[in-house]
UniProtKB/Swiss-Prot annotation:
One Pfam family cited in the UniProt record for this chain: Ribosomal_L29
GO annotation, cellular component aspect: ribonucleoprotein complex; ribosome
Name of this protein: Large ribosomal subunit protein uL29
Domain of life: Bacteria
InterPro entries per UniProt: Ribosomal_uL29, Ribosomal_uL29_sf
Family the entry assigns: Belongs to the universal ribosomal protein uL29 family.
UniProt keyword annotations, A-Z: Ribonucleoprotein, Ribosomal protein
CDD domains listed in its UniProt record: Ribosomal_L29_HIP
Gene Ontology biological process: translation
HAMAP family assigned to the protein according to its UniProt record, in alphabetical order: Ribosomal_uL29
MF terms in GO: structural constituent of ribosome
Amino acid sequence: MAESEKLDVSKLTDIEIKEKIDVTRRELFDLRFQRATRQLNETHRFKKARVQLAQLLTAQGERSRSNT
């Protein structure tokens, strides 16, 4: 993943992170559905969404641990 494509979660607020997590989970659901019905042509989007979700969840966990 190129440096310009990486998600910079350090600049996001907690609310924005939560919203992005919800959006990314919905995107993964849609991609899984497309894959199951063999309509998914851009398979790289699946990996990108999983990586983005992992980054967001990690940032959310780090912030919750640092706030307590």
